[in-house]
Curated annotation (Swiss-Prot):
May sustain the structure of the postsynaptic density (PSD). InterPro entries: Tjap1/BEGAIN. The modification Asymmetric dimethylarginine is found at residue 435. Coiled coil: none annotated. GO terms for cellular component: cytoplasm; membrane; synapse. This is Brain-enriched guanylate kinase-associated protein. The modification Phosphotyrosine is found at residue 186. It comes from Ovis aries (Sheep). Residues 241-271, 288-329, 587-653 are annotated as: Disordered. It is a peripheral membrane protein.
Length: 653
């Protein structure tokens, strides 16, 4: 709405002047003339035109100055901006280069890390596979170790069983040889021609050994070619292998010629040839190829040093010999006790569970190992063999007056029947002293103790042949081991001279004195053999086996042939006997008997052939334990073994 013609214009002019004043106050360089009103400028221009022109000129100059100043400042800012932009561009390029370098480095690191990861993965897989392989090998080796341990255990059990069976078999054969020595010949000796050819060859080999020569024949033609039972027993006797390991450190070079047959006289004790020259002896290696049976070893095979013997072969040989002995002396025994009564045992020895059948395989192993022995090892073996078997005999029972009287009673009839001039030749044993016959003194006779006299009355000197045939029955361990020797009424007869020294002289010794107390003493043949038959649970002398020579019968036992074989009465002794046994065991100083320890079956069943000379050490009273200790049941008891030996004919000579 319009309110007047002049009023709106007047208001607009006032507003413009006010705006210009504000603009001037806000910017100092704005000229002051611009802020003046147009009316004021017109009034000044009308009043003084020259003054107005000068003010305008001043304002123009001031504006030019200000414009130049602003332009210069803008140029400077532009230069600064350009320089800053250039610097920033350079910095940006540098940062980009560094970024590229860092990126490349990171890329390489990442690639290396990936490669290392792949390598680590491959190595882990390889290690895992190797670990699995080694675990499988470990399990396989563990199974092999378990199997080898089981095999070793089985081998150890087998070795122990074979050792026990071998010891048992050796004692049985030694017992058979001892019974052959002590058996009754009924005035008829074995002739050399009656023996089997193989046994004759063995006898010849035994005679060719140094110190093993056969005795010279007597002057009577009836005994011209007879073979004494002692020589037969020596050939049939089984040796005690013993332990060779303790003597291997003391070797000597003097036995190097032994395998070649160059042994010198006196290099070892000569009596060993009497005992260790049998078919199963492990100590005569140079003659073993001649002693072996052709069924086990071929004629062309090379017998090595220290080759093992097959025990069943030697048993078969002994059976053949016993069969020949049975045919030769059949008239001396009843028909019920000949080999025909035991038809199942006429052939070779069957291999039982007790005597194992591993000897053939072990013989092959020994044959393979024999070629690896050197001369020094052979010398060590020979020297240890010489030292091992040079032991002293236990001759306590040989010095008993009752033993001498019993042996003399047996030897008296034969001494009267033989030629009076039985010559004494040079002894084939260089190490033994000469022993001439002496009439006085309790010197034991030549003949061994007669087992048949043990069953006769004390006054009888010898059984009649017919009575022996009628009353004969097999002896057992209980019959012989428990009964004392009978007191013979006959005086001791002088010893019979023989080329090799007396049999009793060499086997049982001559040591003893007048103070020997032999009352109730058990037979020396079965003494320690019976002692080994003790069970381990017997409470006798605090669980230890007592020397059987102290075990006496409780009463006066009848030794008639019809007497039955009862158990040993001294094993279940009365109170008085037990007290007497304790006195004999503990009070050694009050007893005239020498104190002896436990004797193994080897010492009494396999007597040594060395003479009991005065040079023997009297202080050596103890003997070692058996080489193979008895452990458990071997499947064959001692009495069964004796029965088997009886059935095989070892008592039929």
């Amino acid at each position: 709405m319009w309110t007047g013609g002049r009023r709106p214009g007047r208001l607009r002019r006032a507003a413009s002047a006010a705006d210009m004043e504000k603009l001037r106050l806000r910017s100092a360089w704005v000229p002051s003339c611009l802020g003046q009103s147009r009316n004021l400028q017109g009034r000044r221009a009308r009043s003084s035109p020259s003054l107005w022109d000068s003010s305008l000129q001043e304002q123009k100059g001031e504006l030019r100055k200000r414009l130049s100043y602003t332009t210069h400042r803008l140029e400077k800012l532009e230069n600064e901006f350009d320089s800053t932009r250039h610097f920033l561009e350079i910095e940006l390029r540098r940062a980009q280069e560094e970024l590229e370098k860092v990126t490349e480095k990171l890329r390489r690191i990442q690639s290396n890390y990936m490669a290392l990861q792949r390598i680590n993965q491959e190595l882990e897989d390889k290690l895992f596979r190797m670990g699995q392989h080694y675990e499988e090998e470990k399990r396989a080796l563990s199974h092999e170790i378990v199997a080898l341990n089981s095999h070793l255990l089985e081998a150890k059990v087998t070795i122990d069983k074979l050792s026990e069976d071998n010891e048992l078999y050796r004692k049985d054969c030694s017992l058979a040889a001892q019974l052959l020595q002590c058996s009754q010949a009924y005035g008829r000796g074995r002739k050399m021609a009656e023996l089997p050819a193989e046994f004759q060859e063995r006898m010849n080999l035994h005679a060719e050994k140094p110190g093993c020569s056969l005795p010279a024949p007597p002057r009577r033609p009836a005994y011209a070619d007879s073979v004494p039972p002692c020589v037969l027993a020596k050939v049939l006797e089984k040796p005690d292998p013993g332990s060779l390991s303790s003597h291997l450190s003391e070797a000597s070079a003097q036995d190097l010629g032994f395998p070649e047959g160059l042994e010198k006289p006196g290099s070892r004790p000569p009596y060993k040839g009497d005992i260790y020259c049998s078919d199963t002896a492990l100590y005569c290696p140079e003659a073993r190829h001649q002693d072996r049976r052709p069924s086990v070893e071929g004629p062309g095979s090379d017998v090595g040093f220290l080759q093992a013997q097959n025990s069943t072969d030697s048993t078969a040989e002994e059976e053949e010999e016993e069969e020949e002995d049975t045919e030769a002396g059949a008239a001396a025994y009843p028909a019920s006790y000949r080999h025909e009564a035991f038809g199942g045992y006429a052939a070779s020895l069957p291999t039982s569970s007790s005597y194992s059948s591993f000897s053939a395989a072990s013989e092959e192993k020994e044959h393979a190992q024999a070629s690896t022995l050197t001369a020094s090892q052979q010398a060590i073996y020979l020297n240890s063999r010489d030292e091992l078997f040079g032991r002293k005999p236990a001759a306590a029972y040989g010095s008993s007056p009752r033993y001498a009287a019993a042996a003399a009673a047996v030897a008296a009839p034969l001494e009267a029947a033989m030629a009076p001039g039985f010559p004494r030749t040079v002894s084939p044993f260089p190490g033994e002293p000469f022993r001439f016959p002496l009439s006085p003194g309790p010197q034991p006779a030549l003949m061994p103790p007669n087992l048949w006299n043990l069953r006769a009355k004390p006054g009888s000197a010898r059984l009649v042949a017919g009575a022996g045939r009628g009353q004969w029955r097999p002896l057992s361990v209980d019959d012989i081991g428990a009964y004392p020797f009978p007191a013979a009424a006959a005086a001791p007869a002088p010893s019979l001279a023989s080329p090799g020294g007396g049999f009793n002289d060499r086997y049982f010794g001559a040591r003893g004195g007048p103070g020997d107390n032999a009352e109730g003493r058990a037979s020396p043949l079965y003494a320690s053999y019976k002692a080994d038959s003790f069970s381990e649970g017997d409470d006798l002398s605090q669980g230890h086996l007592v020397e059987p020579r102290y075990l006496r019968a409780a009463g006066d036992l009848s030794l008639s042939p019809g007497h039955s074989a009862d158990p040993l009465p001294s094993y279940a002794a009365s109170e008085g006997d037990r007290e007497r046994l304790g006195v004999q065991l503990l009070g050694a100083s009050g007893s005239p008997e020498p104190e002896l320890s436990l004797r193994s079956s080897r010492d009494s069943l396999e007597p040594s052939s060395m003479e009991a000379s005065p040079e023997m050490h009297p202080g050596a009273r103890l003997s070692p334990q058996p080489a193979f200790p008895r452990a458990g049941s071997s499947g064959l008891s001692r009495k069964d073994s004796l029965t088997k030996a009886q059935l095989y004919g070892t008592l039929l000579n």
